[in-house]
Design a protein with these regions (language model features):
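Glycine/proline-rich active-site loop of Rossmann-fold NAD(P)-dependent oxidoreductases
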Residues: 148, 162, 173-182, 217-227
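Conserved beta-loop-beta element that borders a ligand/cofactor-binding pocket
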Residues: 119, 152-175
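Alpha-helical substrate-binding/gating segment
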Residues: 184-192, 200-234
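N-terminal Rossmann NAD(P)H-binding glycine-rich loop of SDR-like oxidoreductase domains
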Residues: 4-24
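Mid/C-terminal beta-alpha module of Rossmann-like enzyme folds, strongest
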Residues: 213, 220-267, 300-310
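Conserved Rossmann-fold NAD(P)-dependent oxidoreductase catalytic core, especially the SDR/UDP-sugar
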Residues: 82-87, 99-141
Length: 401
């Protein structure tokens, strides 16, 4: 049994986390500014304390004394039209709130040994088709700057010996709250569809997996630094819209033009149109297992739980045995140049990626061939790279999507 503090405990993610901690037998101190607290927090010790306020550090330090870990989720919601005052609250609630929590932990005599702080996919800004592992540099738009300041404050805890994890969360999917809850009425009415071009990458994670990853971060000493809290099932906004429409058995063809989104939502619209091809590299390396890895199954679980329905999938499976030593086979098939050897000359296969090509996890390759004189281009991502053993590549663009 552990003693865990959770800030932002009355939010939909915080409430789910507190419920999971209590269910496994942990003691929980739930911090909230007050208001209508969910009944499920009843077995937690409630501290009515605004951790984003000036002067809260002494009271906060007293409450954190003797805890094993703190999960910091408090912060102003980014949803809605952004006024200058709203943007200031978004920034200050994260920077000041995190600073207060870190200062309070530092003031403890026997303080927490682990600190898990929320961050967001906005850290990367809009990056089109660039694969984004935790090593990628930050973006330079408003939310990216907020996340940089947020994580900088959080990582101060590591300077005095507290194991610190920053979870860069994608779109957290739940039926009762968050972005998906706002989308559901529109899609149920049959007027939902892609936003803008729909080609932007939308990193996402089921609420249950988001909470499970927080528990994983609390429990595993090897987990530290930035962690992309997203599903490995990479998806564009257009595919997300199609999958949601299928889960609801409703059409999903009503595009929302970028200009219209900008007029209605202002600067906030850019967060919906931004593209982040986030890879959960660190979580995979640490051995985290997703319960809801597939987008189609995750959406069915949320909108139609217990139905037993399965998403409609067309699967083509093929295998081939090569009678040669594995290192030799790996060397041949992992070299993209050899794709030309395997492709009929009439298709005029070409590699567009500049050479030399360093094959590795996260590597992106561009190809072109011609079919009856028409050029076809596609793009693949090396999703897994285990030298001399195996590799997995995923098509991002091309004729099979």
């Amino acid at each position: 049994m552990k003693r865990i503090g959770v800030t932002g405990a009355s939010g939909f993610i915080g409430t789910a986390l507190v419920e999971a901690l209590l269910a496994r037998g942990d003691q929980v101190i739930a911090f909230s500014r007050g208001g209508n607290l969910p009944a499920s927090l009843g077995r937690a010790r409630i501290e009515l304390l605004d951790v984003t306020s000036q002067g809260c550090v002494p009271a906060l330090a007293a409450a954190l004394e003797g805890l094993d870990a703190v999960v910091h989720l408090a912060g102003e919601t980014v949803a809605g039209r952004w006024s200058q005052a709203k943007k200031q609250r978004i920034h200050d609630s994260r920077q000041l709130g995190t600073r207060n929590v870190v200062d309070a932990m530092r003031a403890c005599t026997a303080g927490p040994r682990a600190f898990v702080c929320a961050s967001a996919s906005g850290y990367y800004g809009s990056r089109h088709d660039e694969p984004l592992t935790e090593e990628a540099p930050p973006g330079d738009d408003f939310l990216a700057r907020v996340c940089v300041d947020w994580e900088r404050e959080a990582m101060r805890a590591a300077d005095f010996g507290i194991r610190t994890v920053c979870l860069r969360q994608g779109l957290v999917l739940a039926a009762h709250d968050g972005a998906l809850a706002q989308m559901l009425p529109v899609f149920r009415a049959g007027v939902g569809g892609p936003l803008g071009s729909g080609s932007q990458w939308w990193p996402w994670i089921h609420l249950e997996d988001d909470v499970a990853l927080m528990l994983f971060a609390i429990d595993h000493d090897a987990c530290r630094g930035a962690v992309n809290a997203v599903s490995p099932d990479l998806t564009t906004n257009a595919r997300f819209s199609q999958a949601l429409g299928h889960a609801l058995r409703r059409p999903s063809l009503a595009y929302a033009p970028s200009l219209a989104l900008g007029l209605v939502l202002g600067e906030f619209a850019q967060t919906l149109l931004s593209s982040q091809l986030m890879l959960p590299a660190r979580a995979q390396d640490l051995g985290f297992v997703w319960r809801h890895e597939s987008l189609d199954r995750a959406l069915l679980d949320i909108v139609d739980p217990g139905s037993g329905r399965e998403p409609r999938l067309t699967v083509f499976e093929s295998s081939q045995v090569v009678e040669a030593a594995l290192p030799r086979v790996f060397l041949f098939f992992s070299d993209p140049v050899n794709l030309a050897v395997l492709t009929p000359p009439a298709l005029d296969f070409r590699i567009l990626t500049p050479r030399p090509i360093e094959m590795r996890h996260g590597c992106v390759l561009d190809y072109q061939l011609r079919l009856r004189g028409f050029p076809l281009r596609w793009k693949t991502l090396v999703e897994r790279w285990e030298p001399q053993t195996r590799f997995i590549d995923l098509q991002l663009r091309g004729p099979y999507l």
